[in-house]
């Protein structure tokens, strides 16, 4: 890169003493003659320096000094490239193009904003985004080339250790997998990124180590291919590895560590594994302690070991196989600790070496044989086999070779398992095209370079050769496309260096030949190199001038000197056949499998189409050459993209740029070589529009053309006229050779400088005129200010003189006045002191007297308050006692009134009976009077007829008068009887009125008394009903006792039916006849039990249909059905019918689930509507509880039994279904509570709104008609519910739990409504609530039910808040102390609901203020009422019954199941 012409004033770069470059400006050029030209330059620091003119390099200035593509630099030279990268790095631009190569400088900082999903979409969808240097631009170009050209693609990522190669490869794979979602609507076949990156912990553990330069350095290269199908969907991936650094297993430099897996194993294994593998600390092992670095800051090896184990499981390596891997690693560590000592010229191992025994045990070989082949070697001749002793150095080499051999085989096997987990074979069949990512080491050169650096640089030579071809191919294709006058040129190639390495008589061939010789050594190998290579490859091979055992190879990037000391050992890296035979016969199955795998893999990689007579072992160089050849074949068949990763500083500091280090890497990785190759052509190119826009200022505006191409040619001709060799015109672009564009930049700078000078002169004249005018104005203004200031000064002097005279006069008078006042003040002070003392003594006396008086007053007030509080408490207690006495007296009066009312009631009955009798007589007499009246009418009619017929009445006067007289007497008698009847009826009516009035009075008294008396009547009647209702259940529980007594015998008898070792039972369990009979019918009974173990047949036997059983009327059915089910379960377990029992219990759970789901609860229905569903649900609830109790009983039997096999067989099954039945039991309990809640709907109204005490009814409520259910109806409904619960044969604990939960629900809802409702309460209405709650508590006493936790006691105590006195704050304290079951917050809520009765005074203000203060106190403290909770929806733990239930009496169920014969037989046997 020669510099262009430099003139005085040009910017340039000058080399300093450190071999770096400083920015400078050319001041003077001087020709000293003899072709020696010197120049004087001024550095940026201002120092002048004289240097050789030829050493100066052109410097780019302005916008062109840090372009996005280094080939666009006007001057292409090392300092310009380095400065451009430095500027971009400081501006947080870590990516820069260098032709087709992307240079990436590691920022040593996480930059998520550089790689987010939006950026992926931007690079994928916008073609112009590829012009921006970025990892995604390379990946985008690669992906689009695959989609358009259908050609395989490869991205080569290279660089030093710690330069960011792995991270770059990771983000490239992330891009390639993420764009699948963009192209295919988010449907990605597999996340290859996650699968490949999931293997990173494994590859890092087994292939990474801490070096001097990097804490996590990859000591191998890899090539990851991502395969696509015809639809460009990702189908899989594959990982190929190259050149694992095997020597690191046995040797380390200071400050380095071995592979991470060894340290992870030591710190992360369990104590059991540590003892099993004889592991100690890392410092105790020879292979780990050489570097004196056991830990890395910020790295937790124990946690990494857990991650590694999890990753091994992910790729399909089982835990047992992982144990084998770790055992092998431990064996390698013990192998390195085997101490080989020298006796004269022979190596020897002590037989009692502990590490020898441990290594042999872990490897599965004989310790003596292992020690033998370490210190001995076997030589085969044609006639015999000779065993000779090895030297100390050779024995140690053999020991280390075995360790390296086994570790290399283990590493290749792990890579094979990773590829198997990625399903590579199937990928090859389904793949259409692929994109490969090569993460390979960059060019390496250290103070001492060995076999590893030689192979790495050999690989980089091959890649550089491919890169040279690729660059020239692309460049020349663009020249042809643009139609340039271009002849294809020859370009420099590094084939000579490659031939030096890989020819027949090259370095690798001579190395393999020396390794095959029995007496080969590194001195003879170096001699062969020096004898044969300098003549043929003198340009690339150079002998060492010193006899230091090294040779030099001139690589494309740098001349590297290699030490040949370890070349032969590292190249052969094989173990003797005796060791291979020893390990193949190992007792460790994994060792033999690993050796077979490794040998097959090596033989497959080294297949030679030409068959040779002698079978040769493959060497490291031959295997690496073969794999590198395959890689280059693969890469050459694809379209290649290059990324060079640069390490900016050695300390790994973020955003810190070290120019010397970056410069050495740029030279080593071939970036400058890339620029040199590009400069042979036309590296600088511009579109016509871009060139015209930038350089149009070189022409006057009159010469500007609308056609950009013409304008571009005019500009070019104005700068470099008649110079067609340095540029060419294409179809859409103009091309320039290297450094030509600098002339345009120089002309551009000169034009801008000339224009700037002209512009500056005009601007400076303008500003000078402005400054002059501003100065004149300022001078005029300053003069006026000064004149005014002088005038004011003269006036001030005159004013000061006058003021001085006045001040003197005042001062003299002030002095005299002050002297007089001081005398007066002294007199006053003396007087004040005297008076003060007198007043102070008087004050002290008065203070003592007032204090004594005040203390006496306070003491008397305290005694008075104390006495008053005592009296007040006594009065309150007395009031409570007197009120209770009065209440009891009132109760007795009501009882007496009720007695008198009963007497009146009996009298009323007698009067009603007499009234009824008299009414009957009255009706009969009325009928008689009617008959007589009819007869009278008939007689009157006949008389009138006779009067008309008799002409002479005197003839008939005597007989007629006699008849009339007789008839008239009868009529009079009838009328008299009728009047008597009417009088008697009137008397009876009046008596009935009086009796009715007395009955009304008695009824009123009865109603007053019924509030207290009815509870006693209910208690007596319900006690009788309870005693009678308990009779069937008592009979049932007596039957259960009988079942429990025969339980043990039944178990033994069933074991005789199904258990083969029945002879082991005691003889006294059952007699021989029963035993023989049961054993003979074993097969029949076994078949019957299997048929009975189906839920469908069982439910058909009991008449189950749609959740209802045909014998549901009695509670014996619950015991009967549960006993049959338990018997079948017990029989199935005894007969070892595990499958049938599992299906039977599963179907039983399904039936119970259907019953729960099929029960529909409807609101707003009567109690009769819920009676049958509640009875059915209670039946199934009791049945389910008995079945679950039996399963729990079986678990307790098995847990204390002696047959562990039976326990292990049945306990998991029983425990599983016991949990299922427990969940179903909770579901049934919740269903029962919902039904009970519907049955007790209206209970809140009954507790809070029932007005059962007429004396305590408010005036506002006298005319209101009560609505809803009252307290007596609620108690009747509770009685009916209690009957249903008793009839369901529930266990006592279930019965108490169910009723307690129902009372809890009623009490909580009523208490919440009382506190948070809207209706106000007086002391009378509160007394009604207290009475209603007492009736409900009394009902609990009658039934023997606990109500302590049912919220009834707080409800009972709440009315006291309304009834106690409320005059002042002390009364509030009394209320809080009396209502101890209520929190202060609840008391405040109740007091807010209080309303005085009609005619009562409102609450005093003092009491209201005390309530408000209490309320504010709890609001400020954030108090919330924690007492009122709702237990609905919580699963209540239900304890199983202690006694199981089995049904052994024959019934219709057993008859339906055809088990009657077995039941009868068992019943007889248990008698």
From Swiss-Prot:
GO terms for biological process: actin filament bundle organization; actin filament organization; actomyosin contractile ring assembly actin filament bundle convergence; formin-nucleated actin cable assembly; protein transport to mating projection actin fusion focus. Residues 65-749 form the Myosin motor domain. Keywords: Actin-binding, ATP-binding, Calmodulin-binding, Coiled coil, Cytoplasm, Motor protein, Myosin, Nucleotide-binding, Repeat. GO terms for molecular function: actin filament binding; ATP binding; ATP hydrolysis activity; calmodulin binding; microfilament motor activity. InterPro entries: Dilute_dom, IQ_motif_EF-hand-BS, Kinesin_motor_dom_sf, Myosin_head_motor_dom-like, Myosin_N, MYSc_Myo5, P-loop_NTPase. It comes from the Eukaryota. Residues 753-773, 776-796, 801-821, 824-844, 849-869, 872-892 form the IQ domain. PROSITE patterns: DILUTE, IQ, MYOSIN_MOTOR, SH3_LIKE. ATP binds at residues 159-166. Residues 1171-1417 form the Dilute domain. Residues 7-61 form the Myosin N-terminal SH3-like domain. It is found in: Cytoplasm. Residues 909-952 form a coiled coil. Residues 628-650 are annotated as: Actin-binding. One of its GO terms (cellular component) is cytoplasm. Pfam families: DIL (PF01843), IQ (PF00612), Myosin_head (PF00063). Belongs to the TRAFAC class myosin-kinesin ATPase superfamily. Myosin family. Involved in cytokinesis. This is Myosin-51. It comes from Schizosaccharomyces pombe (strain 972 / ATCC 24843) (Fission yeast). The lineage of its organism: Eukaryota, Fungi, Dikarya, Ascomycota, Taphrinomycotina. The gene is myo51.
């Amino acid at each position: 890169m020669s510099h262009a012409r430099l003139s005085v004033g040009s910017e340039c770069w000058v080399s300093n003493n450190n071999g770096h470059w400083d920015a400078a400006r050319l001041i003077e050029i001087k020709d000293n003659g003899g072709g020696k030209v010197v120049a004087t330059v001024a550095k940026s620091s201002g120092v002048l320096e004289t240097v050789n003119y030829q050493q100066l390099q052109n410097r780019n200035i302005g916008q062109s000094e840090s372009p996005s593509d280094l080939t666009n630099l006007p001057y292409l030279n090392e300092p310009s490239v380095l400065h451009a990268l430095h500027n971009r790095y400081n501006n947080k631009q870590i990516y820069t193009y260098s032709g087709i190569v992307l240079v990436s400088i590691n920022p040593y900082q996480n930059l998520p904003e550089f790689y987010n999903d939006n950026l992926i979409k931007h690079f994928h969808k916008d073609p112009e985004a590829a012009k921006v240097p970025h990892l995604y631009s390379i990946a985008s170009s690669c992906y689009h080339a695959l989609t358009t050209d259908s050609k395989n693609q490869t991205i080569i990522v290279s660089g030093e250790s710690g330069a960011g190669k792995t991270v770059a490869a990771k983000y490239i794979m992330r891009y390639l997998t993420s764009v699948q979602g963009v192209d295919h609507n988010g449907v990605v076949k597999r996340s290859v990124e996650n699968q490949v990156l999931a293997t990173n912990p494994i590859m890092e553990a087994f292939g990474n180590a801490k070096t001097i330069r990097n804490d996590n350095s990859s000591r191998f290269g890899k090539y990851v291919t991502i395969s696509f199908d015809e639809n460009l969907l990702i189908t899989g991936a594959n990982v190929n590895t190259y050149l694992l650094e095997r020597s690191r297993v046995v040797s380390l430099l200071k400050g380095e560590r071995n592979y991470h897996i060894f340290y992870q194993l030591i710190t992360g294994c369990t104590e059991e594994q540590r003892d099993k593998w004889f592991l100690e600390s890392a410092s105790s092992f020879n292979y780990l302690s050489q570097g004196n670095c056991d830990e890395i800051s910020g790295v937790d090896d124990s946690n990494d070991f857990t991650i590694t184990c999890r990753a091994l499981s992910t790729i399909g390596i089982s835990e047992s196989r992982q144990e084998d891997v770790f055992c092998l690693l431990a064996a390698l560590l013990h192998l390195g600790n085997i101490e080989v000592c020298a006796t004269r010229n022979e190596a020897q191992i002590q037989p009692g070496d502990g590490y020898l025994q441990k290594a042999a045990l872990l490897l599965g070989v004989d310790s003596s044989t292992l020690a033998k082949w370490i210190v001995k070697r076997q030589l085969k001749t044609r006639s015999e086999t000779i065993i000779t002793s090895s030297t100390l150095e050779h024995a140690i080499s053999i020991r280390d070779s075995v360790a390296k051999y086994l570790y290399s085989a283990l590493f290749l096997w792990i890579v094979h398992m990773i590829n198997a987990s990625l399903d590579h074979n199937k990928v090859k069949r389904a793949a259409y095209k692929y994109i490969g990512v090569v993460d390979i080491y960059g060019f390496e050169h250290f103070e001492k370079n060995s076999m590893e650096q030689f192979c790495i640089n050999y690989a980089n030579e091959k890649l550089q050769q491919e890169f040279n071809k690729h660059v020239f191919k692309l460049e020349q294709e663009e020249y042809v496309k643009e139609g340039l006058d271009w002849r294809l040129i020859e370009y420099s190639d590094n084939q000579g260096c490659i031939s030096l390495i890989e020819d027949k008589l090259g370095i690798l061939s001579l190395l393999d030949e020396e390794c095959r010789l029995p007496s080969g050594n590194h001195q003879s190998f170096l001699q062969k190199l020096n004898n044969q290579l300098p003549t043929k490859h003198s340009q690339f091979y150079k002998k060492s001038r010193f006899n230091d055992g090294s040779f030099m190879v001139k690589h494309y990037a740098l001349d590297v000197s290699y030490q040949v000391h370890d070349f032969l050992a590292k190249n052969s890296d094989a173990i003797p056949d005796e060791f291979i035979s020893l390990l193949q016969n190992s007792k460790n199955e994994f060792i033999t499998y690993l050796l077979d795998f490794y040998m097959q893999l090596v033989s497959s990689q080294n297949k030679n189409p030409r068959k040779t007579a002698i079978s040769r072992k493959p060497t490291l160089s031959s295997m690496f050459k073969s794999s590198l050849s395959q890689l280059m074949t693969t890469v050459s068949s694809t379209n290649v993209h290059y990324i060079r990763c640069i390490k900016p500083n050695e300390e790994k500091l973020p955003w810190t740029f070290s120019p010397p280090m970056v410069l050495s890497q740029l030279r080593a990785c071939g970036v400058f070589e890339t620029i040199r190759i590009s400069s042979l052509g036309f590296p600088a190119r511009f579109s016509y529009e871009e060139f015209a826009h930038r350089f149009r200022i070189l022409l006057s505006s009159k010469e500007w053309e609308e056609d950009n191409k013409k304008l571009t040619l005019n500009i070019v001709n104005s700068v470099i006229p008649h110079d067609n060799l340095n540029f060419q015109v294409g179809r859409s672009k103009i091309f320039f050779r290297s450094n030509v564009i600098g002339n345009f930049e120089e002309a551009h700078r000169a034009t801008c400088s000339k224009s700037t000078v002209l512009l500056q002169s005009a601007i400076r004249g303008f500003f000078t005129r402005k400054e002059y005018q501003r100065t004149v104005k300022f001078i005029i203004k300053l003069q006026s200010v000064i004149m005014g200031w002088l005038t004011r000064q003269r006036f001030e002097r005159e004013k000061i003189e006058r003021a001085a005279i006045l001040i003197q006069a005042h001062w003299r008078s002030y002095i005299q006045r002050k002297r007089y006042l001081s005398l007066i003040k002294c007199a006053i002070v003396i007087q004040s002191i005297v008076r003060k003392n007198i007043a102070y003594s008087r004050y002290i006396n008065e203070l003592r007297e007032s204090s004594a008086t005040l203390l006496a007053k306070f003491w008397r007030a305290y005694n008075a308050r104390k006495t008053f509080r005592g009296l007040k408490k006594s009065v309150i207690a007395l009031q409570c006692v007197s009120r209770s006495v009065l209440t009891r007296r009132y109760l007795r009066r009501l009882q007496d009134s009720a007695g008198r009312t009963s007497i009146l009631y009996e009298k009323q009955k007698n009067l009603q009976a007499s009234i009824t009798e008299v009414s009957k007589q009255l009706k009969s007499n009325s009928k008689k009077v009617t008959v007589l009246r009819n007869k009278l009418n008939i007689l009157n009619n006949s008389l009138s007829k006779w009067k008309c017929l008799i002409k002479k009445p005197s003839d008939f006067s005597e007989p007629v008068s006699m008849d009339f007289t007789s008839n008239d007497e009868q009529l009079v008698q009838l009328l008299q009887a009728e009047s008597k009847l009417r009088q008697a009826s009137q008397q009876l009516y009046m008596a009935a009125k009086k009796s009715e009035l007395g009955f009304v009075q008695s009824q009123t008294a009865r109603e007053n008394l019924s509030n207290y008396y009815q509870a006693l009547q209910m208690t007596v009647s319900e006690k009788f009903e309870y005693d009678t209702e308990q009779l069937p259940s008592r009979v049932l529980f007596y039957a259960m006792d009988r079942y429990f007594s025969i339980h043990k015998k039944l178990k033994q008898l069933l074991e005789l039916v199904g258990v083969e070792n029945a002879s082991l039972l005691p003889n006294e369990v059952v007699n021989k006849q029963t035993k023989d009979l049961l054993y003979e019918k074993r097969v029949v009974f076994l078949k019957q039990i299997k048929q009975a173990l189906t839920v469908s047949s069982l439910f058909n036997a009991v008449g189950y249909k749609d959740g209802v059983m045909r014998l549901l009327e009695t509670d014996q059915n619950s015991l009967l059905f549960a006993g049959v089910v338990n018997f079948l379960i017990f029989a199935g377990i005894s007969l070892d019918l595990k499958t049938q029992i599992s299906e039977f219990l599963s179907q039983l759970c399904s039936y119970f689930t259907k019953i729960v789901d099929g029960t529909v609860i409807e609101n707003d229905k009567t109690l009769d509507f819920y009676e049958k569903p509640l009875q059915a649900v209670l039946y199934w609830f009791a049945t389910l509880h008995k079945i679950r109790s039996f399963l729990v009983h079986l678990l307790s039997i098995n847990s204390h039994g002696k047959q562990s096999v039976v326990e292990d067989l049945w306990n998991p099954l029983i425990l599983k279904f016991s949990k299922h039945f427990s969940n179903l039991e909770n579901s049934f309990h919740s269903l029962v509570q919902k039904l009970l809640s519907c049955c007790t709907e209206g209970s809140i109204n009954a507790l809070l709104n029932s007005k059962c005490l007429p004396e305590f009814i408010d005036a506002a409520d006298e005319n209101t008609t009560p609505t809803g259910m009252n307290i007596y109806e609620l108690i009747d409904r509770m009685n009916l519910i209690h009957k249903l619960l008793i009839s369901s044969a529930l266990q006592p604990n279930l019965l108490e739990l169910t009723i307690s939960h129902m009372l809890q629900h009623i009490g909580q809802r009523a208490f919440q409504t009382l506190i948070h409702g809207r209706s106000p309460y007086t002391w009378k209405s509160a007394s009604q609530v207290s009475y209603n709650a007492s009736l409900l508590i009394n009902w609990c006493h009658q039934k023997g039910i606990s109500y302590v936790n049912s919220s009834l006691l707080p409800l009972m105590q709440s009315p006291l808040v309304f009834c106690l006195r409320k005059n002042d704050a002390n009364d509030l304290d009394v209320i809080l102390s009396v209502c101890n079951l209520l929190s202060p917050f609840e008391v405040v809520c109740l007091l807010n609901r209080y309303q005085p009765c009609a005619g009562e005074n409102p609450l005093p203000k003092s009491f209201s203020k005390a309530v408000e203060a209490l309320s504010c106190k709890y609001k400020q403290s954030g108090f919330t009422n924690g007492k009122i909770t709702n237990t609905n929806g919580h699963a209540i733990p239900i304890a199983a019954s202690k006694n199981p239930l089995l049904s052994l009496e024959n019934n219709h169920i057993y008859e339906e199941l055809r088990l009657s014969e077995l039941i009868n037989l068992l019943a007889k046997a248990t008698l």
